[in-house]
């Protein structure tokens, strides 16, 4: 006899939070794919790296798709947030803490200790998990994999796989489906494939293109005006100059116009890879964000502080790149500083002239 007390007031059988057999199989497939990556991390020498890489990524995809199909296609259309507060991974439970620690550790190693992932700096072959991605990197760009290629691949896999899951969850809402398809497209095409194809162009002596995600707009693309980036564009002929001009136009024309018409959602929800990951892989965790007014105020202060910092640092970077001799440069350091001052003054004047009332209602702390 089961003596467990069920506090549900449902007259019918309460919702079961247990996994179905299909979901368990799907999780097993996904974990197997992750296990292959873990084996590579510990420098396992696979006999056929291409086979095991595709097997790993394929199992992760297949597991996510099968799980999503059983979770949503067996139910009526509508938002399903079943048991998010009862699952350990999505309710600050043990699995959630373990996942957070693992991801934080991965980012620390990725940025500061890539050699532990198998990256070599002496010209020798990669090892570890980075070597597992070498075949795919050679296929796309003709170069060995780096820690950033590994990260970009896993990032793209997460958006595509969980984007499919998100589209099933919101299959009753065409807007959400189109928006999700958009971020999946931009991540796969603009953030992942096109930069790799651009790197292959560098095999020609006529090109020295830097890494450039076309959809990444300043200040998100904070390195656009670094000297190595500008020199790479300018030394790559018409294509390089076109890409540099497109980057500048994106900042001063495309982004302001679309933001004025549609708000920041046109970028954060439809284009940006950061928002794309948050809306796909991060969807099961959105309820954990703080809803306090203080959290919202802190966010506003941080956002605008970072923006001011970005403007100052970018101005300093471009200033240091330019020359001083007006006979050698049409855009000198002094002309640039005057231009920045005039631009900021015009923006301030326009806002105060046409948006003073709206600013008075919104700019509160």
What does each model-found stretch correspond to?
Residues 2-365:
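Non-ligating segments of multi-cofactor redox enzymes
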